Amino acid sequence: MNTLGHFLRLTTFGESHGSVIGGVLDGMPSGIKIDYELLENEMKRRQGGRNAFTTPRKEDDKVEITSGVFEDFSTGTPIGFLIHNQRARSKDYDNIKNLFRPSHADFTYFHKYGIRDFRGGGRSSARESAIRVAAGAFAKMLLKEIGIVCESGIVKIGGIEAKNYDFNHALKSEIFALDKEQEEVQKTAIRNAIKNHDSIGGVALIRARSLKRNQKLPIGLGQGLYAKLDARIAEAMMGFNGVKAVEIGKGIESSLLKGSEYNDLMNQKGFLSNRSGGILGGMSNGEEIIVKIHFKPTPSIFQSQQTIDIKGNECECLLKGRHDPCIAIRGSVVCESLLSLVLADMVLLNLTSKIEYLKTIYNEN
Protein backbone atom coordinates (compact mmCIF):
# COMPACT_ATOMS: atom_id res chain seq x y z
CA MET A 1 0.00 0.00 0.00
CA ASN A 2 1.08 3.57 -0.54
CA THR A 3 -0.90 5.24 2.25
CA LEU A 4 0.01 5.95 5.88
CA GLY A 5 -2.53 6.98 8.52
CA HIS A 6 -6.29 6.89 9.02
CA PHE A 7 -7.68 10.29 10.01
CA LEU A 8 -4.64 12.10 8.60
CA ARG A 9 -3.71 10.09 5.52
CA LEU A 10 -0.57 10.47 3.44
CA THR A 11 -0.46 8.84 0.01
CA THR A 12 2.81 9.07 -1.90
CA PHE A 13 3.81 8.35 -5.48
CA GLY A 14 6.83 8.51 -7.76
CA GLU A 15 10.20 6.86 -8.26
CA SER A 16 13.81 7.80 -7.63
CA HIS A 17 14.57 8.67 -11.26
CA GLY A 18 11.10 9.67 -12.42
CA SER A 19 10.27 13.26 -13.28
CA VAL A 20 8.58 13.95 -9.92
CA ILE A 21 7.72 12.44 -6.59
CA GLY A 22 4.59 13.60 -4.83
CA GLY A 23 2.07 13.21 -2.07
CA VAL A 24 -1.50 13.87 -1.05
CA LEU A 25 -2.14 14.66 2.62
CA ASP A 26 -5.84 14.19 3.34
CA GLY A 27 -7.56 15.06 6.61
CA MET A 28 -5.61 18.18 7.53
CA PRO A 29 -7.96 20.54 9.41
CA SER A 30 -8.67 23.92 7.88
CA GLY A 31 -7.31 27.16 9.30
CA ILE A 32 -3.74 26.06 9.98
CA LYS A 33 -1.21 28.72 9.05
CA ILE A 34 1.29 27.27 6.57
CA ASP A 35 4.82 27.83 7.84
CA TYR A 36 6.85 27.90 4.62
CA GLU A 37 10.10 28.50 6.50
CA LEU A 38 9.54 25.36 8.56
CA LEU A 39 8.78 23.39 5.41
CA GLU A 40 11.95 24.59 3.71
CA ASN A 41 14.11 23.93 6.77
CA GLU A 42 12.78 20.39 7.14
CA MET A 43 13.61 19.65 3.52
CA LYS A 44 17.13 21.04 3.95
CA ARG A 45 17.73 18.84 7.00
CA ARG A 46 17.02 15.73 4.92
CA GLN A 47 18.78 17.02 1.80
CA GLY A 48 21.80 15.14 0.46
CA GLY A 49 25.04 16.74 -0.69
CA ARG A 50 25.38 18.88 2.43
CA ASN A 51 28.65 17.34 3.56
CA ALA A 52 30.93 14.30 3.20
CA PHE A 53 28.73 12.16 5.44
CA THR A 54 25.69 11.94 3.15
CA THR A 55 24.98 11.07 -0.47
CA PRO A 56 26.54 13.45 -3.01
CA ARG A 57 23.18 13.58 -4.81
CA LYS A 58 21.85 17.04 -3.95
CA GLU A 59 18.33 17.75 -5.14
CA ASP A 60 16.79 21.19 -4.67
CA ASP A 61 13.77 19.58 -2.96
CA LYS A 62 11.53 22.59 -3.49
CA VAL A 63 8.01 21.62 -2.47
CA GLU A 64 5.36 22.71 -4.95
CA ILE A 65 1.96 22.85 -3.22
CA THR A 66 -0.78 22.17 -5.78
CA SER A 67 -3.93 22.09 -3.64
CA GLY A 68 -5.37 22.37 -0.15
CA VAL A 69 -3.85 25.77 0.69
CA PHE A 70 -5.40 29.19 0.04
CA GLU A 71 -3.94 32.51 1.12
CA ASP A 72 -1.38 30.68 3.29
CA PHE A 73 -3.91 28.64 5.29
CA SER A 74 -5.00 25.01 4.99
CA THR A 75 -8.50 24.74 3.53
CA GLY A 76 -9.45 21.34 4.95
CA THR A 77 -9.25 19.73 1.51
CA PRO A 78 -6.43 17.37 0.45
CA ILE A 79 -3.04 19.05 0.34
CA GLY A 80 -1.31 17.95 -2.84
CA PHE A 81 2.39 18.61 -3.38
CA LEU A 82 5.18 17.72 -5.80
CA ILE A 83 8.97 17.63 -5.72
CA HIS A 84 10.85 17.54 -9.01
CA ASN A 85 13.76 15.13 -9.49
CA GLN A 86 16.42 17.22 -11.20
CA ARG A 87 19.73 15.47 -10.60
CA ALA A 88 19.15 11.78 -11.22
CA ARG A 89 21.96 9.96 -13.06
CA SER A 90 20.34 6.86 -14.53
CA LYS A 91 23.45 5.83 -16.49
CA ASP A 92 25.09 4.87 -13.18
CA TYR A 93 22.74 1.88 -13.05
CA ASP A 94 23.11 0.51 -16.59
CA ASN A 95 25.60 -2.13 -15.47
CA ILE A 96 23.22 -3.63 -12.89
CA LYS A 97 19.90 -3.49 -14.73
CA ASN A 98 19.82 -7.29 -15.03
CA LEU A 99 21.43 -8.00 -11.65
CA PHE A 100 20.07 -8.21 -8.13
CA ARG A 101 22.05 -5.94 -5.82
CA PRO A 102 22.79 -7.72 -2.51
CA SER A 103 20.41 -6.76 0.33
CA HIS A 104 18.37 -4.43 -1.89
CA ALA A 105 14.71 -4.72 -2.85
CA ASP A 106 15.62 -5.65 -6.45
CA PHE A 107 15.10 -9.38 -5.91
CA THR A 108 11.74 -9.14 -4.17
CA TYR A 109 10.30 -6.43 -6.44
CA PHE A 110 11.25 -8.41 -9.55
CA HIS A 111 9.70 -11.65 -8.30
CA LYS A 112 6.55 -9.92 -7.05
CA TYR A 113 5.82 -7.73 -10.07
CA GLY A 114 7.83 -9.34 -12.88
CA ILE A 115 9.25 -5.93 -13.73
CA ARG A 116 11.33 -3.38 -11.85
CA ASP A 117 12.69 0.10 -12.34
CA PHE A 118 16.40 -0.52 -11.86
CA ARG A 119 17.28 3.20 -11.91
CA GLY A 120 18.20 4.01 -8.34
CA GLY A 121 15.82 1.39 -6.99
CA GLY A 122 12.71 3.00 -8.44
CA ARG A 123 9.86 3.06 -5.94
CA SER A 124 11.92 1.28 -3.27
CA SER A 125 14.46 4.11 -3.15
CA ALA A 126 14.75 6.32 -0.08
CA ARG A 127 14.28 9.23 -2.49
CA GLU A 128 10.55 8.82 -1.79
CA SER A 129 11.19 9.80 1.83
CA ALA A 130 11.47 13.45 0.79
CA ILE A 131 7.68 13.35 0.48
CA ARG A 132 7.34 11.94 4.01
CA VAL A 133 9.46 14.80 5.34
CA ALA A 134 7.34 17.39 3.52
CA ALA A 135 4.17 15.78 4.89
CA GLY A 136 5.76 15.61 8.33
CA ALA A 137 6.31 19.37 8.18
CA PHE A 138 2.57 19.88 7.67
CA ALA A 139 1.91 17.51 10.58
CA LYS A 140 4.31 19.55 12.73
CA MET A 141 2.29 22.67 11.95
CA LEU A 142 -0.81 20.91 13.29
CA LEU A 143 0.99 19.59 16.39
CA LYS A 144 2.41 23.03 17.17
CA GLU A 145 -1.15 24.33 17.52
CA ILE A 146 -1.67 22.00 20.49
CA GLY A 147 1.81 22.31 21.96
CA ILE A 148 3.56 19.14 20.73
CA VAL A 149 7.03 19.08 19.18
CA CYS A 150 9.08 16.19 17.77
CA GLU A 151 12.88 16.13 17.55
CA SER A 152 15.64 13.66 16.74
CA GLY A 153 19.34 12.91 16.78
CA ILE A 154 21.90 10.16 16.35
CA VAL A 155 22.57 7.92 19.34
CA LYS A 156 24.97 5.45 17.79
CA ILE A 157 27.16 5.06 14.71
CA GLY A 158 28.43 1.51 14.46
CA GLY A 159 29.37 0.68 18.05
CA ILE A 160 30.06 4.27 19.11
CA GLU A 161 27.25 5.39 21.39
CA ALA A 162 26.27 8.79 22.73
CA LYS A 163 26.60 9.19 26.47
CA ASN A 164 24.70 12.47 26.64
CA TYR A 165 21.67 13.66 24.67
CA ASP A 166 21.63 17.27 23.49
CA PHE A 167 18.94 17.86 20.86
CA ASN A 168 20.03 21.46 20.36
CA HIS A 169 23.51 20.26 19.44
CA ALA A 170 22.04 17.68 17.06
CA LEU A 171 20.44 20.48 15.05
CA LYS A 172 23.87 22.03 14.47
CA SER A 173 25.81 18.81 13.92
CA GLU A 174 26.75 17.59 10.42
CA ILE A 175 25.66 14.09 11.40
CA PHE A 176 22.91 15.16 13.85
CA ALA A 177 24.99 13.81 16.74
CA LEU A 178 23.35 14.05 20.15
CA ASP A 179 26.66 13.89 22.01
CA LYS A 180 29.22 16.56 21.15
CA GLU A 181 31.97 14.60 22.90
CA GLN A 182 31.36 11.47 20.81
CA GLU A 183 30.68 13.24 17.52
CA GLU A 184 34.21 13.27 16.15
CA VAL A 185 34.68 9.57 16.95
CA GLN A 186 31.42 8.80 15.17
CA LYS A 187 32.53 10.87 12.17
CA THR A 188 35.81 8.95 12.05
CA ALA A 189 33.89 5.68 11.92
CA ILE A 190 31.94 6.97 8.91
CA ARG A 191 35.10 8.24 7.22
CA ASN A 192 36.75 4.84 7.69
CA ALA A 193 33.75 3.10 6.15
CA ILE A 194 33.91 5.44 3.13
CA LYS A 195 37.68 4.91 2.80
CA ASN A 196 37.13 1.15 2.70
CA HIS A 197 34.32 1.47 0.12
CA ASP A 198 31.93 0.28 2.80
CA SER A 199 29.00 1.58 4.87
CA ILE A 200 27.98 1.57 8.52
CA GLY A 201 24.81 1.19 10.57
CA GLY A 202 23.42 3.47 13.24
CA VAL A 203 20.71 4.24 15.75
CA ALA A 204 18.53 7.35 15.85
CA LEU A 205 16.57 8.64 18.84
CA ILE A 206 13.24 10.34 18.20
CA ARG A 207 11.22 11.99 20.92
CA ALA A 208 7.98 13.90 21.27
CA ARG A 209 7.58 16.38 24.09
CA SER A 210 5.45 19.31 25.12
CA LEU A 211 6.37 22.58 23.45
CA LYS A 212 6.44 24.09 26.95
CA ARG A 213 9.11 22.46 29.09
CA ASN A 214 7.02 22.40 32.27
CA GLN A 215 3.98 20.77 30.67
CA LYS A 216 3.07 17.19 29.78
CA LEU A 217 1.98 15.66 26.51
CA PRO A 218 -1.73 14.89 26.09
CA ILE A 219 -2.81 11.70 27.84
CA GLY A 220 -4.74 9.09 25.86
CA LEU A 221 -3.39 9.40 22.32
CA GLY A 222 -3.88 5.98 20.76
CA GLN A 223 -6.39 3.18 21.30
CA GLY A 224 -6.20 0.19 23.60
CA LEU A 225 -6.21 -2.66 21.10
CA TYR A 226 -6.06 -2.26 17.34
CA ALA A 227 -4.76 1.28 17.11
CA LYS A 228 -2.12 1.22 19.83
CA LEU A 229 0.14 4.24 19.65
CA ASP A 230 3.33 2.19 19.95
CA ALA A 231 2.12 -0.24 17.28
CA ARG A 232 1.33 2.60 14.88
CA ILE A 233 4.72 4.18 15.56
CA ALA A 234 6.51 0.89 14.91
CA GLU A 235 4.51 0.33 11.72
CA ALA A 236 5.41 3.76 10.38
CA MET A 237 9.09 3.42 11.24
CA MET A 238 9.45 -0.12 9.89
CA GLY A 239 7.92 1.11 6.64
CA PHE A 240 11.00 3.24 6.01
CA ASN A 241 14.08 1.99 4.17
CA GLY A 242 16.78 0.29 6.19
CA VAL A 243 14.97 0.17 9.54
CA LYS A 244 15.49 -3.21 11.21
CA ALA A 245 14.30 -2.60 14.77
CA VAL A 246 12.20 -0.11 16.74
CA GLU A 247 12.38 0.40 20.51
CA ILE A 248 9.92 2.26 22.71
CA GLY A 249 11.34 3.50 26.01
CA LYS A 250 13.77 0.96 27.44
CA GLY A 251 12.86 -1.36 24.58
CA ILE A 252 15.16 -4.38 24.30
CA GLU A 253 16.71 -3.66 27.70
CA SER A 254 13.27 -4.27 29.25
CA SER A 255 13.64 -8.01 28.66
CA LEU A 256 16.69 -8.05 30.95
CA LEU A 257 14.98 -6.37 33.90
CA LYS A 258 12.74 -7.45 36.74
CA GLY A 259 9.38 -5.79 37.27
CA SER A 260 10.73 -4.01 40.33
CA GLU A 261 13.50 -2.55 38.16
CA TYR A 262 11.33 -1.64 35.19
CA ASN A 263 8.06 -0.27 36.55
CA ASP A 264 7.52 3.49 36.42
CA LEU A 265 6.46 4.40 39.95
CA MET A 266 4.13 7.33 40.61
CA ASN A 267 3.40 9.96 43.20
CA GLN A 268 0.98 12.89 43.30
CA LYS A 269 3.14 14.83 40.86
CA GLY A 270 3.22 12.03 38.27
CA PHE A 271 5.67 9.39 37.09
CA LEU A 272 9.06 9.07 38.77
CA SER A 273 10.70 7.53 35.66
CA ASN A 274 9.91 6.94 32.00
CA ARG A 275 11.08 3.44 31.14
CA SER A 276 7.82 2.91 29.25
CA GLY A 277 8.77 5.64 26.82
CA GLY A 278 5.61 7.66 27.37
CA ILE A 279 3.18 4.91 26.33
CA LEU A 280 1.08 2.59 28.53
CA GLY A 281 -1.61 0.25 27.25
CA GLY A 282 -1.12 1.57 23.75
CA MET A 283 -1.87 5.16 24.79
CA SER A 284 0.26 8.17 25.67
CA ASN A 285 0.63 8.72 29.42
CA GLY A 286 1.74 12.36 29.29
CA GLU A 287 5.47 11.70 29.52
CA GLU A 288 7.90 12.23 26.65
CA ILE A 289 7.51 9.64 23.91
CA ILE A 290 10.90 8.03 23.34
CA VAL A 291 11.62 5.94 20.23
CA LYS A 292 14.90 4.41 19.07
CA ILE A 293 15.31 3.40 15.44
CA HIS A 294 17.96 0.87 14.39
CA PHE A 295 19.24 1.19 10.80
CA LYS A 296 21.17 -1.46 8.92
CA PRO A 297 24.32 -0.43 7.01
CA THR A 298 23.56 1.04 3.59
CA PRO A 299 23.48 -1.96 1.22
CA SER A 300 24.96 0.13 -1.62
CA ILE A 301 28.70 -0.29 -1.14
CA PHE A 302 31.53 0.08 -3.64
CA GLN A 303 32.97 -3.41 -3.30
CA SER A 304 32.64 -6.31 -5.71
CA GLN A 305 29.95 -8.65 -4.33
CA GLN A 306 28.63 -12.02 -5.38
CA THR A 307 25.04 -12.09 -6.65
CA ILE A 308 22.84 -13.53 -9.41
CA ASP A 309 21.23 -12.04 -12.49
CA ILE A 310 17.53 -12.18 -13.42
CA LYS A 311 18.11 -15.58 -15.09
CA GLY A 312 19.68 -17.05 -11.95
CA ASN A 313 23.28 -17.03 -13.15
CA GLU A 314 25.96 -16.26 -10.57
CA CYS A 315 27.91 -13.08 -11.23
CA GLU A 316 29.74 -10.19 -9.60
CA CYS A 317 28.12 -6.86 -8.79
CA LEU A 318 30.13 -3.64 -8.53
CA LEU A 319 28.01 -0.57 -7.94
CA LYS A 320 28.41 2.96 -9.20
CA GLY A 321 26.30 5.95 -8.25
CA ARG A 322 25.88 8.19 -5.21
CA HIS A 323 24.88 6.67 -1.91
CA ASP A 324 24.72 7.47 1.80
CA PRO A 325 27.52 5.84 3.81
CA CYS A 326 25.16 5.75 6.80
CA ILE A 327 21.37 5.65 6.37
CA ALA A 328 20.78 6.63 9.98
CA ILE A 329 21.93 10.24 9.55
CA ARG A 330 19.28 11.46 7.12
CA GLY A 331 16.99 8.65 8.24
CA SER A 332 16.67 10.29 11.65
CA VAL A 333 14.96 13.28 10.02
CA VAL A 334 12.59 11.01 8.11
CA CYS A 335 11.64 9.10 11.26
CA GLU A 336 11.07 12.35 13.12
CA SER A 337 8.64 13.29 10.35
CA LEU A 338 6.94 9.90 10.60
CA LEU A 339 6.45 10.29 14.35
CA SER A 340 4.89 13.70 13.68
CA LEU A 341 2.49 12.17 11.17
CA VAL A 342 1.49 9.36 13.52
CA LEU A 343 0.90 11.73 16.45
CA ALA A 344 -1.12 14.14 14.31
CA ASP A 345 -3.24 11.21 13.13
CA MET A 346 -3.78 10.12 16.74
CA VAL A 347 -4.70 13.65 17.83
CA LEU A 348 -7.51 13.66 15.27
CA LEU A 349 -8.57 10.13 16.25
CA ASN A 350 -8.76 11.21 19.89
CA LEU A 351 -11.58 13.65 19.09
CA THR A 352 -13.92 10.65 18.96
CA SER A 353 -12.96 9.22 22.37
CA LYS A 354 -15.42 11.20 24.52
CA ILE A 355 -18.90 12.54 23.82
CA GLU A 356 -17.87 15.73 25.61
CA TYR A 357 -15.41 16.47 22.82
CA LEU A 358 -18.13 16.20 20.19
CA LYS A 359 -20.57 18.24 22.27
CA THR A 360 -17.96 20.98 22.58
CA ILE A 361 -17.73 21.15 18.80
CA TYR A 362 -21.39 20.85 17.87
CA ASN A 363 -23.02 22.70 20.76
CA GLU A 364 -21.10 25.82 19.76
CA ASN A 365 -23.54 26.08 16.87
Swiss-Prot record:
SUPFAM superfamilies: Chorismate synthase, AroC. InterPro entries: Chorismate_synth, Chorismate_synth_AroC_sf, Chorismate_synthase_CS. This is Chorismate synthase. Its cofactor is FMNH2. The keyword Amino-acid biosynthesis applies. Belongs to the chorismate synthase family. PANTHER family: CHORISMATE SYNTHASE. Keywords: Amino-acid biosynthesis, Aromatic amino acid biosynthesis, FAD, Flavoprotein, FMN, Lyase, NADP. The keyword Transport does not apply. One of its GO terms (molecular function) is chorismate synthase activity. This reaction introduces a second double bond into the aromatic ring system. Transmembrane segments: none annotated. Homotetramer. GO terms for cellular component: cytosol. Its EC number is 4.2.3.5. PROSITE patterns: CHORISMATE_SYNTHASE_1, CHORISMATE_SYNTHASE_2, CHORISMATE_SYNTHASE_3. Pathway: Metabolic intermediate biosynthesis; chorismate biosynthesis; chorismate from D-erythrose 4-phosphate and phosphoenolpyruvate: step 7/7. It is an enzyme of class 4 (lyase). It catalyses: 5-O-(1-carboxyvinyl)-3-phosphoshikimate = chorismate + phosphate.
